[in-house]
């Protein structure tokens, strides 16, 4: 029975005893109880340098790892999460608003000829892409896919324009020949892709639709038509398209799919335009405020726009667009003879058809030819159009201009002046002011507004002035006696309008009642029509008259409700009229330039649930501390592989660039050699001609000398040119002495000099061209870079590779760290085994008693605290043999039974023996310093 139980039995009081047991991991000298127990074996071991060295070793290893991580982090600067790009991360990429600063290059065949990169320099966008979820696209672009004026097509057009101006003299000389290769470029048959380098990429929209935004409550027009992209993917290059082209009406069949994708449909199926016969407008809406040619390239704008409906309010390209323009692939399947099916409704060949003003009715400019709309004739013009300029150029490509081009894809440009595409896809002929009358016969029933055309009905064709329920005025256009084709509105109320009307000259008693004049009706007096402001900003009700002609006054909504409007039709359409620059500009609108955090090639599909992936990655990071050894090796291996991969990729790109420069230089050198050969041939021909003249001169001099010697009539000697040989005025028998027949085929001196001058001019030109080609070849050869110069030029690392000279040191350091780590990993278990064998493990038992227990034998004399210590009774000296026996016994009783571990333990017997012997020797000087423990005398309980 323990002391606590005896105390309870005797006193009846509880004696609470707290017993705590914990493993003694950190041994300190002050925690060791002195008394009966001799200083333990572990105490001198703890006081030695063994444990501190291992602590320093751990700190040193951690320092090495932290240093390596810092070095790797500063050099790589990429986290593991950054390798997963554009995947369920709205901040994985950022849109680039100013695309003019984005570097771009073209990729095509014969790249050195056209200043592009080889086809393998960038991955194929059909293979290399990354899908981007709809949520990310919506969050980044807010359902508004913006318009961008890309500078790449403008650069291409500028290059062609510059080349045409530089070779204008040569072009005038060529009459019946073409320059091979250039015609292919001008015709758009040289195709390629536009690519952007890392860290930039292209976000390609693969599914989109349009919807109206910012509806004007006064006019009902949509200030903006926004594009909502619902599916997108990231690529490096665009689709294949012509690198350049002059003005053309029809495009190749290869472009049909890309052009058809630009026919964007409306998102909302409940829009009013969906219920109309023609449906809603399809196409790409170039927004209001777009700059087709930016300010920094204003020299390309020209005077008048050559792009049909793509123009500003002055018919030029100097100002931003003030009216929305739609560009779409024309639906030629329903056309008749190359024209829309309703063109037969034209009146006397008018350009206005069904509310649309059409341009280019007779013919279209196509690759230097004038083609008819029906495809029945084509005329060679001798001129080509590039941008806003026209050049005289002999251009006859190898295609049949008389073929049936009407089935080829063609762009249709529509300029919607009213901008009410969400209400109707039909165009209307605007009414004149004298055709606008007040409805007195209840022709209009219901309540409608500029935003609600279906709220009222009409029963008779006409143009009716209607008092809106919102307080403004409406002009309701009714056609076919029951169809409302348009509503124009203004915030000016009915009372204000009548006050202005009464102030017009001669209109004090006039009205706007309808008179039966024509199908649409009109007012009785045209000089008292709906009022408007003239050019002097004064109110008037009469149209302007000049030379017996009355000016036409049309009406539009909003601010133009009270001004003089000249446009008769609400839409302007044209087909063709675009060149390669604008063709590329339209096709590039499906792309947005973005900047990514990390860019890798290959197909990366979107994961189904990125949150689960992040949780798994977080769990892996939480467990990563158990794999530190493996992690360090893996990081080192990844670093080495990354360096090798980066070097390989960089060398590959540099090699491609070097081949490009080399090929260009070789081609230029070949041209120089050919020019030198031409100069040599011309020189040889000139030498032959000079030699021939010298022979003729010698022969003539010889004959003259013979005549003078034989006749000696110097004063009568006279030579003149006659039938290309020389005769004299002397006697006729003189001619028998000279045989002139051999010189009849020779030219005169004047002809010989003229021909010699021609040879001289030709030779001078050839020598000049040869020198220019030689100089150009030398410059091209000097431009051939080596691998490292190519890397610096392409990537602009500007000394980033300066640290490569430290790679051997880094590699040796890494190998040394690996070896040191391996040695430590081998020695650490041995040291741990040694510590385990040499240091017994104790448990600390703490007994706390509230009262002294009544224990029998409390008055017993226990001595001075040293009597019961067996070790203190006999002072035995520790010898080497005893230490060896003790070490051998520890090895025999070790808990490790595996053969390989026991073999390793044999190596520890000798150091263990030395440790035991040294501890024994060190313990001898403590025998006279034994501490006496005074035991408290326990009194007996009463």
From Swiss-Prot:
Modification after translation (UniProt): Specific enzymatic cleavages in vivo yield mature proteins. Envelope glycoproteins are synthesized as an inactive precursor that is N-glycosylated and processed likely by host cell furin or by a furin-like protease in the Golgi to yield the mature SU and TM proteins. The cleavage site between SU and TM requires the minimal sequence [KR]-X-[KR]-R.
UniProt-annotated glycosylation sites, renumbered to this chain: 51, 98, 131, 176, 228, 331, 348, 354, 370, 379, 400, 404, 435, 441, 447, 457, 467, 481, 493, 503, 509, 527, 534
Residue stretches in coiled coil: 663-713, 754-789
GO cellular-component term (any): virion membrane
Protein's UniProt keywords contain Amino-acid biosynthesis: no
Gene3D superfamilies per record: ATP synthase delta/epsilon subunit, C-terminal domain
GO biological process: symbiont entry into host cell; virion attachment to host cell
Keywords of the record: Cleavage on pair of basic residues, Coiled coil, Disulfide bond, Glycoprotein, Host cell membrane, Host membrane, Host-virus interaction, Membrane, Signal, Transmembrane, Transmembrane helix, Viral attachment to host cell, Viral envelope protein, Virion, Virus entry into host cell
Membrane-side (Cytoplasmic) residue stretches: 821-942
Transmembrane segments: 800-820
Function: The surface protein (SU) attaches the virus to the host cell by binding to its receptor. This interaction triggers the refolding of the transmembrane protein (TM) and is thought to activate its fusogenic potential by unmasking its fusion peptide. Fusion occurs at the host cell plasma membrane. The transmembrane protein (TM) acts as a class I viral fusion protein. Under the current model, the protein has at least 3 conformational states: pre-fusion native state, pre-hairpin intermediate state, and post-fusion hairpin state. During viral and target cell membrane fusion, the coiled coil regions (heptad repeats) assume a trimer-of-hairpins structure, positioning the fusion peptide in close proximity to the C-terminal region of the ectodomain. The formation of this structure appears to drive apposition and subsequent fusion of viral and target cell membranes.
Protein known as: Envelope glycoprotein
Species the sequence originates in: Caprine arthritis encephalitis virus (strain 63)
